UniProtKB/Swiss-Prot annotation:
Disulfide bonds: none
Biased composition (Polar residues): 1-15, 23-39, 353-372
A Pfam family matched in the record: DUF4679
InterPro entries xref list: DUF4679 (IPR031461)
Region of interest: Disordered: 1-88, 123-174, 317-412
Domain of life: Eukaryota
Protein name as catalogued: Proline-rich protein 30
Low complexity bias locations: 50-59, 126-142, 334-350
Amino acid sequence: MLPQNKDQVLPQTSVLPGRPTWGFSQLVDSSPHNLQPLSPHQGLPPSQPPFSSTQSRRPSSPPPASPSPGFQFGSCDSNSDFAPHPYSPSLPSSPTFFHQNYLSLPRPRASSPSNHWLYPSPPLTPSFSPSQPQNSSLPHSPCQSPSHPEELHSSTLTSPGPSPPSHRLHSNRQTWRWHQYRDTGSGSPGVVERCVPSEKDPAQFRDPGALAQALVVQLGHRRIAHDLRLLLLQHLWLGRTGQAPVVEYPICLVCLRPRSPSCPLPRYRTGPRLLAFPQLLPCVQGQESGPLRIGIGFGLRLPQGQARALHLLPEKRPKEAGPQGKATQACGHQLPASQPPAAQARADPVPGTPSQTRSFRSAGLQSPNSPRCFSGPPPRAPKQVTTSLKPRPCPGPKRPVSLELILQKSSV
């Protein structure tokens, strides 16, 4: 039983002798207004050869001679030798190597000069309605076969640029990375956070440990552990086993966060820093011997004036050590000349503030004895003089102290 439009179907199926017939592919590729609906009981025309199971797949065979029912074949490169003219005599008359129900997805564009796709279409069934064009199943296909078989002689399958499917996949990947970067970041890229003053004044902590703990919470334990691990691996790689790995974070005492470009300039030349370093801790607290674990210690590096302004230094120690420091300085001036400087250093009671002890030690290193013992210039090797243990008499006021004599005595 033939369709009603015999004058339209018969010229399409009549081809040159020795060439394969097109069959239903002409009906699929033709425009919808030229097609008539098929009845459910209508069978295949006698000119259409049935598909056999032995001719279903031949991956190593040459390209198909004629497109099978439900398939569209196209190429995206005009320089390709794999896409000859459909009516070219160089095409062999071999059967198709893909089954009708076999689905092959379009592959992304590679670096080869010619790329080909085999776009599957749903197989022809009795319930197929020709009111919708067959090419609508592939809206993004870059190369589609012409709608009429007469246009095959004049149509060229060329595409100067890359295929749209590969561009679409690449753009989706970039978009996903950009969204991932925006989600992982603290804010939108290129925007600097403002320095908002903290609700709690740093002077209210009155304890360096509490202030350091508040800064650690703002930084995050995971970030500090990651940075410390990288620094430790760097020291091991470079062979710096003698140096302890210490990570320093410049902080802002206005917002109690890591320093940013929007934070005000520090008052002192060396700004406040948070230190993080590894330390060995016992697994069980209070147990001296046993397995150890690696912990993270924290510290603050502040100028002395800023630490006093924030009341982070105890105030009782300078008051108690003030008169004692003055008394020790007075006793040091009244010591006899025969007393060595080592004994003078031992006679020093409990030291006071760091500034007082620093000034006192520097004075003791510069002059091993009291200034009343000799009138000559002070010795040039104070370290060797302070390490000598033998008492030596104070030289006379008219006899200058020679450096050679001091070195000989210290070497003995």
